[in-house]
């Protein structure tokens, strides 16, 4: 039981469900909302309830959406021939904010991880395969994370695409813009050398 009562204890426990929020962070957030910004706390609670009630997944790309077809999939100006495959909805937002990419997306909602029981069916690979078969896609851009699981997922998807004669590309990775080689870790530098291209 919390020193300050059951309701605060439940709030602290609820806040800890967020990624990266431990006991101290949860306590700091809870005390801030209760001591300094109760109106903000009410607004947060209302916005969270509304999002939980209204948000679903787009039937085509699986991004979070309030409708069955998200605004990206409904936009006829986007290139239907390019399909960028990402792990999470936040990846779509990052790409949209940082690039001029104008194709379509497919969100896996994770990555292959057999040890954790996450196989192709959990990632919607059947829906992805259907899109590859029916959507006249000419290029699949693999933008999964550069982890062992992300690489395995990218390989699996590249096999799906290549058996259908669809060009598969992988986003570049390596030395960041403005990065100095002496400060780059060896794995990143190794990938950068392997992924070098002609100028």
UniProtKB/Swiss-Prot annotation:
Similarity remark: Belongs to the RecR family.
Sorted UniProt keywords: DNA damage, DNA recombination, DNA repair, Metal-binding, Zinc, Zinc-finger
Residue span, Toprim domain: 81-176
Zinc fingers (C4-type), renumbered ranges: 58-73
Biological role: May play a role in DNA repair. It seems to be involved in an RecBC-independent recombinational process of DNA repair. It may act with RecF and RecO.
One of the GO biological process terms: DNA recombination
Molecular function per GO: DNA binding; zinc ion binding
Listed transmembrane segments: none
Protein name (Swiss-Prot/TrEMBL): Recombination protein RecR
Organism for this UniProt entry: Nitrosococcus oceani (strain ATCC 19707 / BCRC 17464 / JCM 30415 / NCIMB 11848 / C-107)
Any one Pfam family match given in the protein's UniProt record, by short name: RecR_HhH
Lineage start: Bacteria, Pseudomonadati, Pseudomonadota, Gammaproteobacteria, Chromatiales
HAMAP family referenced in this protein's UniProt entry, alphabetically: RecR (MF_00017)
Superkingdom assignment: Bacteria
InterPro entries to which the protein is assigned, alphabetical: DNA_Rcmb_RecR (IPR000093), Rcmb_RecR (IPR023627), Rcmb_RecR_Znf (IPR015967), TOPRIM_dom (IPR006171), TOPRIM_RecR (IPR034137)
SMART domains: TOPRIM
